[in-house]
Amino acid sequence: MTLVIPRLYAIMDALLLRTGAFAVADALASAGVGVIQYRDKQISARNLLSHSRELVSICARHGARFVVNDRPDVAALAGAGGVHVGQEDLPVEDARAICGRDSWVGISTHNEVQVREAEATSADYIAVGPIFPTSTKQQADSVVGLELIRKARSMTRKPLVAIGGITVENAEQVWRAGADSVAVARDLCAAEDPAAKAREYLRRASHL
């Protein structure tokens, strides 16, 4: 059965957060964000596991799904609702073997070949990007624009999550290009009021 993914996919990047991850997760989940991913490339595995367990608990209180970035082992041990892997991380099927059938496994793609390869896996959703220029990642991939979303939409029935440089001002055109969800990091994490910003995304999504 095809996954129905929320219109807004929040990414809490440790380098962007203005306040603690736990407080931000609670604010986002209470605002109605249905899926929250935590990304911290510098934290130790032990601390990532500890953080993830607490974030699982926080998200569960509000009915949100928590996703771990990169680490299926941590996701499984923490009882997270999913893991997101990149092109250099463990393959989707290996992540699935670690996390189980009930866990979401998502994968990042940056071109048509990768989208086609992802379609042939058990990935629950396919992330496509970066759609717009972004400074969130130190070594960002080349901007793919809305055109790759349109092409990917014709290539797969899996949910598409657009990522990269997405703001509340340009989110609508991304959804209308064929994305089921927009993954947002900086525009939420760096916001003075992440919950208010999240509610604005959700308000705009409700008018599609």
Predicted region positions:
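A short, flexible beta-alpha/helix-coil linker loop
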Residues: K41, F132-T134
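Hydrophobic alpha-helix-in-membranes signature
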Residues: G129-F132, K158
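Glycine/threonine-rich flexible loop motifs
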Residues: T136-Q138
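Conserved N-terminal beta1-alpha1 strand-loop-helix module at the mouth
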Residues: M1-L90, A97-D124, D141-V144, K151-L160, ...
